[in-house]
Amino acid sequence: MTDNSRLRIAMQKSGRLSDDSRELLARCGIKINLHTQRLIAMAENMPIDILRVRDDDIPGLVMDGVVDLGIIGENVLEEELLNRRAQGEDPRYFTLRRLDFGGCRLSLATPVDEAWDGPLSLNGKRIATSYPHLLKRYLDQKGISFKSCLLNGSVEVAPRAGLADAICDLVSTGATLEANGLREVEVIYRSKACLIQRDGEMEESKQQLIDKLLTRIQGVIQARESKYIMMHAPTERLDEVIALLPGAERPTILPLAGDQQRVAMHMVSSETLFWETMEKLKALGASSILVLPIEKMME
């Protein structure tokens, strides 16, 4: 029997977002065994249950109040939202925050040997897709009529199979399109993973746990986007060195034993430190430059 006092989080069982979701939960300190085939896994150190389901089931589970939170791609979430609105429903949920993984784009693609003069080239054409509502919204806004061919997989083979004139599908590198004689011609939606919460009253203990989880997620994302930098820098050029690190907090400056001309600098930078920046630092007289990853961070 389900314990309603435990926080329920839905995540993709397998696929594009599964590994990243699992890593995020682990880095937030949630100890859970997700290596078994069980669809419900219980955290060892927190009152949290993880439901491992198909990604297109997650928005509905949250909107219907079956689970408290869901980790889902914005593309899947928006498609389900449009689908429910088309059926006269008023789906409710909260987006707690966008996450730093799961980036993709939903694009139109046509055979490479066909001319492309913009979206109007699709007027009256048949388009295969797994995202009929996102596609319809985009083309309706441009006043383009089309016929939709709904496919739940292998969308890219539709033109060769004679099922459609073009496709609308998720694209990462474009290699799959190229292998099927297609080219990406228009991006209609850009997506990342996000964390969503069900609407309605939440028990105080659950809300406190959600707030704690959000703080940890923020710390994980900040740590990924930040680097800890250490170096020796000439005293007379400190301002120039600091100016090369936009987004950095004010550095900690320590004296070097037996050296009055240089100091040791420690700082956290919120931007990626590229080789070009390191070379400029060296040109200013900095030495022993170390750039280290940060595992956890809390402001």
UniProtKB/Swiss-Prot annotation:
Pathway: Amino-acid biosynthesis; L-histidine biosynthesis; L-histidine from 5-phospho-alpha-D-ribose 1-diphosphate: step 1/9. InterPro entries: ATP-PRT_HisG_long, ATP_PRibTrfase_cat, ATP_PRibTrfase_CS, ATP_PRibTrfase_HisG, HisG_C, N-reg_PII-like_a/b, N-reg_PII/ATP_PRibTrfase_C. Its EC number is 2.4.2.17. Keywords: Amino-acid biosynthesis, ATP-binding, Cytoplasm, Glycosyltransferase, Histidine biosynthesis, Magnesium, Metal-binding, Nucleotide-binding, Transferase. Equilibrium between an active dimeric form, an inactive hexameric form and higher aggregates. Interconversion between the various forms is largely reversible and is influenced by the natural substrates and inhibitors of the enzyme. Belongs to the ATP phosphoribosyltransferase family. Long subfamily. This is ATP phosphoribosyltransferase. It comes from Escherichia coli O7:K1 (strain IAI39 / ExPEC).
